[in-house]
Amino acid sequence: MKSIIDVKNLSFRYKENQNYYDVKDITFHVKRGEWLSIVGHNGSGKSTTVRLIDGLLEAESGEIVIDGQRLTEENVWNIRRQIGMVFQNPDNQFVGATVEDDVAFGLENQGLSRQEMKKRVEEALALVGMLDFKKREPARLSGGQKQRVAIAGVVALRPAILILDEATSMLDPEGRRELIGTVKGIRKDYDMTVISITHDLEEVAMSDRVLVMKKGEIESTSSPRELFSRNDLDQIGLDDPFANQLKKSLSQNGYDLPENYLTESELEDKLWELL
């Protein structure tokens, strides 16, 4: 499958006189339609990397190619039209007095008719389950509802790439599951490429590949299953998945379980076989 993002030998530091790089000579790609999770400890370079991809920061060296176009100062605004970002705190993204005004805001500079704008706003809000709240003030929404509205604002723009920068980190477990389910549906309906920066295991499990960053460099790239089989997850800012913890406990008590990582549903099926 063709890559929609190619990052080659990318380096960046926030201050020219600092003796270390925040992102150091990284190279990776993202396939069209893929869900890539980026994980690692705070300060490992995750958020800096996606801000470089979106053109919010300018690299010191290396190149970024988005859908065949090399990112430059001249085309950064055109390339940004292909990318939508949702951040950790949705309050920083709200500009409209109502939910529907906020979702419509980004469409106003696209030369769309009022009818098309209204259609896109309602489709996006329906997709994230927030159509009934379109007249509500954003400040009166819960954290999970605010994040869904923020995603609706991005989806209405029809970007090819959706970047979630720790978008689920401030939500409770139920809110996280709902938001991850929403993103899963959007990806399927719009064939969207997703990059998520996260510490959430459920979010990582939904992805096709996982890129681990450490001290500004790429430590490894693997499938979620391969990642969860590692014994050093705490060293890269992740907890051991519950299914892994349970499997280890059961194995210690005499249950013959396979060595490879099992999802919770796979573990449940295996236990039924053993009982």
UniProtKB/Swiss-Prot annotation:
SMART domains, A to Z: AAA
Single GO term (MF): ATPase-coupled transmembrane transporter activity
Enzyme class, UniProt record, top EC level: translocase
Any Gene Ontology CC annotation: ATP-binding cassette (ABC) transporter complex
InterPro entries, sorted: AAA+_ATPase, ABC_transporter-like_ATP-bd, ABC_transporter-like_CS, ABC_transpr_CbiO/EcfA_su, ECF_ABC_transporter_ATP-bd, EcfA_1, P-loop_NTPase
PANTHER family: ENERGY-COUPLING FACTOR TRANSPORTER ATP-BINDING PROTEIN ECFA1 (PTHR43553:SF24), HEAVY METAL TRANSPORTER (PTHR43553)
Similarity comment: Belongs to the ABC transporter superfamily. Energy-coupling factor EcfA family.
Subunit relationships: Forms a stable energy-coupling factor (ECF) transporter complex composed of 2 membrane-embedded substrate-binding proteins (S component), 2 ATP-binding proteins (A component) and 2 transmembrane proteins (T component).
Listed name of the protein: Energy-coupling factor transporter ATP-binding protein EcfA1
Protein species of origin: Streptococcus pneumoniae serotype 2 (strain D39 / NCTC 7466)
Top-level taxonomy: Bacteria, Bacillati, Bacillota, Bacilli, Lactobacillales
